[in-house]
Amino acid sequence: MDIHEILKYLPHRYPLILVDRVVSLELGKRIHAYKNVSINEPYFSGHFPHHPVMPGVLIVEALAQAAALLTIRSENMEKDAGQVYYFVGIDGVRFKKPVIAGDQLVLKVEITRQLKGIWKYSACAEVDGQLVTEAQLMCTARAI
């Protein structure tokens, strides 16, 4: 799934679209996606000058966006159908290594549970095959 298709499903836009490509998607199970981290990211001007490090909260947001794509596609949710998909909880976040300009984040998200409109996921981000972030995420769809 390229960026044009991603934009059909996610409501996010610049500067907060944090998934560049989906490389594999198993409906109802898992997704693998990429976020290419460029020196042109707006947050690098302040985090940190002369040592650009991607804020951990944005790595988690990238994982949540990948989770949203997985669920929106798995559940055949329509964009602009009077509902929005919210990130509602997070547990066990660990940041193992910094992510810097030039890195490619590999986002891996797996559905672990779905109950009463709440989806739970096991998520991790890797750079060059090394774990940089891991977390348990929770999301839900709500009427707007």
From Swiss-Prot:
Lineage: Bacteria, Pseudomonadati, Pseudomonadota, Betaproteobacteria, Nitrosomonadales
Domain of life where this protein originates: Bacteria
Residues forming the catalytic site: H47
Gene3D superfamilies in UniProt: Hotdog Thioesterase
Gene name per UniProt: fabZ
Organism of provenance: Nitrosomonas eutropha (strain DSM 101675 / C91 / Nm57)
Enzyme Commission designation: 4.2.1.59
GO cellular component: cytoplasm; membrane
Protein known as: 3-hydroxyacyl-[acyl-carrier-protein] dehydratase FabZ
Localization per Swiss-Prot or TrEMBL: Cytoplasm
Subcellular location, principal: cytoplasm
InterPro entries, alphabetized: FabA_FabZ, FabZ, HotDog_dom_sf
PANTHER family: 3-HYDROXYACYL-[ACYL-CARRIER-PROTEIN] DEHYDRATASE (PTHR30272:SF1)
Gene Ontology biological process terms, A to Z: fatty acid biosynthetic process; lipid A biosynthetic process
